[in-house]
């Protein structure tokens, strides 16, 4: 098995468009996932080096531009109106505040600015304000990303015309396990939004969360779904659940660190040209665990003290870790 992977690791030669013949299956992905840990990381590092500078990390900053009051019942989220998290709903943030925070993000080394709103989908009355945020943030010299819930084709086109670079809409988990986590929005709804985003010419950011109570096969199957999209996401965020007080999953069991690193490696092997982002949960990861994730192919992180409503490693810790690992921040010229 190892010799086969070394000579032609499934995924390395894949192009953006795939046929049914070379589509991933749970069985083919599981074969890689089950490799001895050292072999899996060796293969992932080889694929990573073939597609990226292994010592550069893309830095993004995430800002919550509208907090709480979301009508969705996502079991992991403190911003859901279904959960007694104590989080107060806010109105849409002003453009001036968004731009002030965007400039701080750029000054900290971020090349992409991600703006998230706790909505099921944007309301028509908010679309002009969102479009203006995109235009003004781009004018600062940053890539833009939005995560606003479901989008219609017209909404995706509106934001594309404003210059939106990326749209984040995670599929969260496997199609099989999805109804155990969310009941107010279907798995197909999520895939439909991703299709609208792609058709509008916006780059796709989509990944999932580990630690929801899913099985290993669910985690792998989530990656199969993403890798088998007509064009895989340009950005694949992999989150480790942060159990939020008041949420339905506040007592969820922690994720095994080795299993988490395996998923990072598998994402790299299955989507070799995508940025794999080490996302939520880094604050509770040891430096050693993060180092393994970078070796396994993660090459993007969110910087800043907070990630929506959860804690994130501060700038000092990230700077120290990157210095000790010999990693440098990516620039737009390097990853555009």
From Swiss-Prot:
Binding-site residues for [2Fe-2S] cluster, renumbered to this chain: 114, 145, 205, 277
InterPro entries documented for this protein: Aldolase_TIM, BATS_dom, Biotin_synth/BioAB, Biotin_synthase, Elp3/MiaA/NifB-like_rSAM, rSAM
Reaction catalysed by this enzyme: (4R,5S)-dethiobiotin + (sulfur carrier)-SH + 2 reduced [2Fe-2S]-[ferredoxin] + 2 S-adenosyl-L-methionine = (sulfur carrier)-H + biotin + 2 5'-deoxyadenosine + 2 L-methionine + 2 oxidized [2Fe-2S]-[ferredoxin]
GO biological process entries: biotin biosynthetic process
Cofactor note as given: Binds 1 [4Fe-4S] cluster. The cluster is coordinated with 3 cysteines and an exchangeable S-adenosyl-L-methionine. Binds 1 [2Fe-2S] cluster. The cluster is coordinated with 3 cysteines and 1 arginine.
Cofactor or coenzyme needed: [4Fe-4S] cluster; [2Fe-2S] cluster
Radical SAM core domain residues: 55-282
EC numbers for this chain: 2.8.1.6
Residues making up the signal peptide according to the UniProt record: none
Record Pfam families: BATS (PF06968), Radical_SAM (PF04055)
Pathway: Cofactor biosynthesis; biotin biosynthesis; biotin from 7,8-diaminononanoate: step 2/2
Family: Belongs to the radical SAM superfamily. Biotin synthase family.
General function of this protein: Catalyzes the conversion of dethiobiotin (DTB) to biotin by the insertion of a sulfur atom into dethiobiotin via a radical-based mechanism.
Record text on subunit structure and interactions: Homodimer.
Record-given protein name: Biotin synthase
């Amino acid at each position: 098995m190892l010799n086969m992977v070394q000579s032609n690791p499934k995924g390395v030669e894949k192009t953006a468009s795939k046929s049914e013949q070379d589509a991933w299956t749970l069985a083919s992905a599981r074969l890689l996932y089950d490799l001895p840990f050292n072999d899996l990381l060796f293969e992932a590092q080889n694929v990573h080096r073939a597609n990226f500078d292994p010592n550069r990390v893309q830095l993004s900053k995430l800002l919550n531009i509208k907090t709480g009051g979301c009508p969705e019942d996502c079991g992991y989220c403190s911003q859901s109106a279904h959960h007694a998290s104590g989080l107060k709903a806010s109105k849409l943030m002003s453009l001036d505040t968004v731009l002030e925070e965007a400039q701080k993000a750029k000054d900290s080394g971020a090349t992409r600015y991600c703006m998230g709103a706790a909505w099921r989908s944007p309301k028509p009355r908010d679309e002009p304000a969102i479009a203006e945020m995109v235009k003004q943030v781009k004018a600062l010299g940053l890539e833009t990303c939005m995560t606003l819930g479901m989008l219609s084709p017209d909404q995706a086109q509106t934001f594309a015309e404003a210059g939106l670079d990326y749209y984040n809409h995670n599929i969260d988990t496997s199609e099989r396990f999805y109804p155990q986590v969310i009941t107010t929005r279907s798995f197909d709804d999520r895939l439909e939004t991703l299709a609208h985003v792609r058709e509008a010419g916006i780059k796709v950011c989509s990944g999932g969360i580990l630690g929801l109570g899913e099985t290993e096969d669910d985690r792998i199957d989530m990656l199969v779904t993403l890798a088998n999209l007509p064009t895989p996401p340009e950005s694949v965020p992999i989150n480790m659940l942060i159990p939020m007080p008041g949420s339905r999953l506040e007592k969820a069991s922690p994720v095994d660190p080795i299993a988490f690193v395996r998923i990072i490696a598998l994402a790299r092997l299955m989507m070799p040209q995508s940025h794999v982002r080490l996302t939520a949960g880094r604050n509770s990861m040891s430096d050693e665990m993060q180092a393994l994730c970078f070796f396994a192919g993660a090459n993007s992180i969110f910087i800043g003290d907070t990630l929506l409503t959860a804690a994130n490693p501060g700038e000092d810790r990230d700077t120290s870790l990157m210095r000790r690992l010999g990693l440098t921040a990516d620039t737009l010229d390097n990853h555009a």
